[in-house]
């Protein structure tokens, strides 16, 4: 009897050590390998195309186009407008920028209203999310389109949480002009701006947003007129503003261009292609979407690109690379076969962030926004912009 009891306890102990049927081992990534399949913590390929990052209270959130299902070319198409049905905007979260947890579809498609901007038959691209310190709202801006790309509008959604669900507010043409490839940027003083391709993608607009980040104030500038720039990605470094952008060659890659300005609404000057290494003249066969400063690591930034696969958009890949800053003021984005964001910036000086007080190498400091002069914007163009005859992906 005693032996039976001992064996029973031994069997129970073994059963307790076995993993539950509901428990799934998490996938751990060892490094970022640009252009290769990147899996989330559940072992599924990350699906967040044309997106951007948001850093909030110690966590990074990655938002992007959730492309699912068959990629099709409509029968009426006269250009390569490959598409998948709109599923929505996805969100992933991470502490280390390497291992990402799927948080779900935070802005889902609206399937029961064919006229809705988010109906599966429409187009939803380039979602970006910013946080409004005044309203405590998370605000999403995106490029929304009709199936034939004639709408050319910006769509806005809001949420009380970074993981949604976001409530769709509506769409419009900012300042009466077309809005396609776009991003949003919040300056140190809390002012937010939308950067977007307009005038049939010939000109890039910069539009100041209202204090709630929900619409334009009416102040904007026209930049790179008739130079056909798209896929803007904006960051601030050493007191200056930088914009990475792409040419307009459809789904095909082209050379990247970096521009710099002393103020967002001021003069932008192109300074060349920052990419170096194999296929740098093709932006590593990818296209810019966002640049994220890495909080807690000083002058550390990641440039995010999409490597589009036009006939299988769900399988489009991500190319993430760290920026390098030379002592002579140059900025480059060198190709890397693999790299680890957890160790990339070791020794650059760590920051520990708290509410109101920050630590720099263990010593408290307060970050105060500097006053900046914003030049009066050029005279606005008329609102009767012609419909788009061709969309460049």
Question: Locations of the language-model features?
Answer:
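Carbohydrate-active catalytic/glycan-binding domains of CAZyme proteins
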Residues: 25-361, 373
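Disordered, acidic Ser/Thr/Pro-rich linker "stalks" and the adjacent N-terminal cap
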Residues: 350-392
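Compositionally biased, low-structure terminal segments
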Residues: 10-13, 18, 167, 352, ...
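Bacterial Sec-dependent N-terminal signal peptides
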Residues: 1-27
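Enrichment for repetitive, rod-forming helical segments
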Residues: 9-11, 314, 370
